[in-house]
Amino acid sequence: TVGGKLADEQQVLCQIAIAVLESVNATATDQCSVGGTDATRQALLGGDIDLYWEYTGTAWVTFLGRKPIQDSKAQYEAVKQQDLIHNNIVWLAPTPFNNTYAFAIKAERAQQLGLRTLSDMAAYIRSGQPGNLCIEPEYQNRDDGFPGLQRAYGFEVPAGRLKVLQAGPIYQAIADQKECLFGEVYTTDGRIPELGLTVLADDKLYHPLYNAAPILRKQIYDRNPNIAKAFAPISAALTNEVMAELNRQRSAEGRSPRRVARDWLGQHGFIANGS
C-alpha cells in the first residue's frame, strides 16, 4: 500500500511509486491522500501504508528532533541511519531535487537588477531601493524562517516594505510586480516556470534541505529488497527542474497525478509507454 500527503508534488510522487512497483510486478494499493505529514508518518509506522515519499529535512528535524545538516548527502545518510535504528524505517535512494524555502523574483527583473543570490537581495534591500518583500504567515515567525534569514544575511526589511500573504497568492504577486518584488516560494513549485520567475540562490546555505526519498518499513523491505534497485534511477532523475515541471502539469494544466507520473516514466523508458 502506497501513501502520500495532500500536496500536488506528493500526489505525483505517490503515483510514480505505484507505477514503479507495478513495473516490477508488485501489487500496489493506492492510498495517495492520507493527510498531512504527521498523519502520513503515523500511517507508515502503524502499518496502514507500506511506503511513501518523505523529505530528509522533515524527518531529521520534525520526527528525530535534530538540528538541520547543511549538506544534502550528509543529511540523507544521517536520517537513513537514525530512522532505521530508532524506527525500523528504510530510506531508499534520494532525489537531487530539494523542495525547500526560497525567494524568487520575476526573471527579467533579476536580470535588469543583476540579482542572482540572497546576498544580492540583502544588499538591494539594505540600499533602500524600492520594492516589497512578501512572505507567508508561518515563515514570518518560524525560527528557521524569516527572523533567522535576516540575521544570516545581515539585512532588515522596514515594516512598510514587508507584506504577509498566504503562500498561494505570492507567486502571482511576484509575477505582477506590483505588490511584491521578492517573494518567498518553494523551490519545486510548478508556478515558478509557469509564471517566469527565477529563484535566488541561497548562497549562505541558510534554509534546511528537503530532498525526497521513498521510505518503507524494514519488514516490507526485507521481503522485497529488489525495490531499492527499481527506485534508484527514478529518484536520480528527479531534479528541481523536472519536479517543478511535473508539478506545473498538475497545478497549471490540471492533469491527473497518475497521467503526469506515467507519461514522464514512459517518456524516459522507466515503464512501458502507455501503461
Residue ranges and their predicted role:
Residues 8-27, 147, 151:
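Short, polar/charged alpha-helical segment
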Residues 63-92, 177-181, 191-204:
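Ligand-binding "clamshell"
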Residues 1-15, 33-36, 138-141:
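Extracytoplasmic "Venus flytrap"
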Residues 36-37, 47-60, 75-76, 167, ...:
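Beta->alpha turn/N-cap motifs
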Residues 50, 128-202:
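Ligand-binding pocket segment of bilobal, Venus flytrap-like solute-binding proteins
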Residues 73-132, 236-240:
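A conserved helix-loop-strand patch within extracytoplasmic ligand-binding domains
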Residues 9, 140-144, 148-152, 225-275:
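An extracytoplasmic/periplasmic, membrane-proximal ligand-sensing/linker region
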Residues 101-111, 210-224:
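A bilobed periplasmic-binding-protein/Venus flytrap-type ligand-binding module shared by bacterial periplasmic
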